Each structure stands twice: as structure tokens, then as C-alpha cells.
Amino acid sequence: MMIINNQIHYPVLLKEVIENLITTKDGIYLDLTIGFGGHSYNIIKILDQKARLIGFDQDLKAIAHCNQLFSEFNNVSLINDNFVNLKKHLQLMQIDNIDGCLIDLGVSSYQLDQADRGFSYHSLGRLDMRMDQNKAVDATKLIQNSTVSELVKIMKNYGEIKDPYRVVVALKKAFEKKELNTLEVVELIKKHVNKAELYANKHPARRYFQALRIAVNNELEVLEKLLSYLPSYLNKGGKIAIITFHSLEEKIVKKVFRHLASISSLNNLPINNELLKKYHNHFNKGLSPTQSELETNRRSRSAKLFVLEKINN
């Protein structure tokens, strides 16, 4: 638990992350979405002084907060950048291998609670949704600059919405007249979705906001690019722990982890012999929060933890 701006924030699946990530107390660990430091602060307290923790975040406010939070530790480095640029930074730091890497793919509680960031469909603010505030295109500009067909594709691919056409047309018409704020967008969505979506258990705007956020931040593309090379940096026994929050992230992580867990360390051919495998996929279906955590932190309800371990060089 952490207090940020008088709000209580809980690192999701913290116990499970610590149990599955830390393999050696004097190793090199990465937190590629350090956010406001909830996971990493608990991790660094367990590690030895010889260990090293490197945290990435594209949100400058998160890095500023972490600079204060970790000021007592001289073995923590913080980098304000998207994790898609990890390889460049590891080369600059002359790091060839790591012992563990955490990636929490969720929007931080702090970002959701800041109405002006535009991530929440419960709060009044500009429809922004940029993780990196220096990016030129936010969600408002994305709607303004995209065609109806482009927006329909975004909603289908990133929101998994079967028929977003009516909502998209209404959005385009509305934004041609003026910029709508988050709550105005929510009302527009409610007005144009079908009754099944309107009265479903989950908020009717949830998938539309998700689709816009993913598109604005290129979330799936950067995740796929990262996972194409990240596992090769692991030392033997090292682990990658990824927390997903929706099925699109989950599909990417599952596909990569399952593929790597089927490859032989000898010749990169598929093999069933566990002794010859290069990687081990710990949780095929992902590890979900306990009932106790769900009762304490509602935002953890869709979280799943996936862990890949390098078992042979």
C-alpha cells in the first residue's frame, strides 16, 4: 500500500510478483513500467546493496515521484522513456544480462485518479490518454485526424467491439463541431450503443476508452517489439514477470511465452524434453489475484501474472 496525493494505491499481485521474480538478491532487475514505485519499492528492500534496480517510465511525473521515493537507495536508476527503447539504454549502461524484469501493463491508479489525464470514464477532463505527455497526438486529436473507417478499425482491433460504427460516426460529427470532454464522450457512447451494451455488467464506455488509449500509446506494437528480444537478456534462472489487464495483452504474452517454452536450447527446434528446453512458462493461464486482494483492491480484478524463466543457456 502507498499514499500518493492522499489516495491509497495498492501494487497489484505484489506478493506473487516478489515470489516469482526475485531469484538472486544481488542481481540486476528491471521494472519497465515503474509508475509510482509500488512494486519496485518493495523489491529493492529485499535486494542486497550489490543488486541493481533500473526503472523505466514514459510519464515524467512518475519518474519525479520515484526520484524522491528511492532517494535513500544508491543502487536504483530511473529512466524517463518508453520501454520500447530498452535495448539502447542497456547498451549505454553496458548491461548484457539481467536477472529479472517486471512489466505491469495497467494504467496506474494515479493516472486514473488524475481527471486531466483523460484515462477515466468516471472523471471530467480533456480526452487525452497520453502516457507520455510530450507526444503530439492525444485521444482528442486522434479522433479529429482519423477517418470513420480508421476509427472503426481501432475500436474493433483494440476494443474488441463488434459493431462500433454508430458510435464512431457520432464521435466524428460531434468532434467536428467542438472538442468533447471525457464525460461528454461517455454520454455520447451511451446514447449510441445498443441496449445489450448499455445495460451490460461492465461500463459501456470501457472498451471505447481502452481502444483509444491503446491506439494513442501504441501499446500492443511496443509490447510485441519488446518481447521479440527481451528474453535473450535473461541470465540462467532469470525471469520475466508480466501483469496483463485485458485479453489483447494476454494473447501477445501467452503466444510469446508458449513459443519460447517449446524451443530447444540446442538448436532452436520444437522439443518436448524439459531438460533441453531453454525457457519455462510458469503459468499457462496466468495467475489471478486472491479473493482477499480483490476485496481490498477492485482495480486488480482483471489482472493476470505471467512468468517466463530461462532454464538453460
UniProtKB/Swiss-Prot annotation:
According to its UniProt entry, the function of this protein is described as: Specifically methylates the N4 position of cytidine in position 1402 (C1402) of 16S rRNA.
Q: Which organism is it from?
A: Mycoplasmoides gallisepticum (strain R(low / passage 15 / clone 2))
Question: Which residues are recorded as binding S-adenosyl-L-methionine?
Answer: 37-39, 57, 83, 104, 111
Alphabetized InterPro entries for the sequence: RsmH (IPR002903), SAM-dep_MeTrfase_MraW_recog (IPR023397), SAM-dependent_MTases_sf (IPR029063)
What are the EC numbers? 2.1.1.199
Query: Where is the major localization of this protein?
Result: cytoplasm
Catalyzed chemical reaction(s) = cytidine(1402) in 16S rRNA + S-adenosyl-L-methionine = N(4)-methylcytidine(1402) in 16S rRNA + S-adenosyl-L-homocysteine + H(+)
Q: Gene name on record?
A: rsmH
Q: Which family does it belong to?
A: Belongs to the methyltransferase superfamily. RsmH family.
Lineage start: Bacteria, Bacillati, Mycoplasmatota, Mycoplasmoidales, Mycoplasmoidaceae
UniProt-listed GO biological process terms: rRNA base methylation
How is this protein named in the record? Ribosomal RNA small subunit methyltransferase H
